[in-house]
Amino acid sequence: MPGHPRDATLTALLRRELVREEHPPTAALIRALAGIHARGAFTRAEFKLMCRWKSPRARHLWETNSPARIRAVSRAVLATRSERRRMELLTGLHGVGVPIASAILTLIDPRRYGVLDIRAWQLLFSLRSVTTNARGQGFTIAQWEQFLSELRRHARHLRVSARTIEYTLFLCHRKFQRGLLYARSERRLRRSNTAV
């Protein structure tokens, strides 16, 4: 059971808003990737599907990874028991930052992982479950580890997957958000409004 007073608000929110149904296209992708663990690696085509799901705009970067490099990295990721090492290996691929790496792990094993996303992070920050990076941008591996720990703790308490917790946080943030998501976008919008 979560033990910090700050957890009461988050636990109540999660209980009230818990989303047990996966987004249908995401559920289909997770099913399509189900054989990865048995093979012990993912293909370049699977890698591209996972990256596109999280960040299609970075395509020009992650598409430059060779099939051999992707295969070697994916084998090492699936072979190690170290969460930090998994993240280090994945972020060693061109165009793969911590959010995309977290998405890859989530799509492969949604029971244990959730996507590190600006929305989920900002909601956790507003509830003081995480205490750094208020904007939820430029994530570090240490922040991902903290995020993952929070997801897993609440997942155990509510007897659901880490992905269920993360997806619920994502949708709650979307539901309750005020203003623009990215601070840089707000500044750009203000500048363009003053120029008119």
Question: Model segments located where?
Answer:
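Helix-hairpin-helix/helix-loop-helix acidic hairpins
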Residues: 52-96
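Generic alpha-helix detector with strongest preference for long hydrophobic helices that associate
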Residues: 31, 71, 85, 100-105, ...
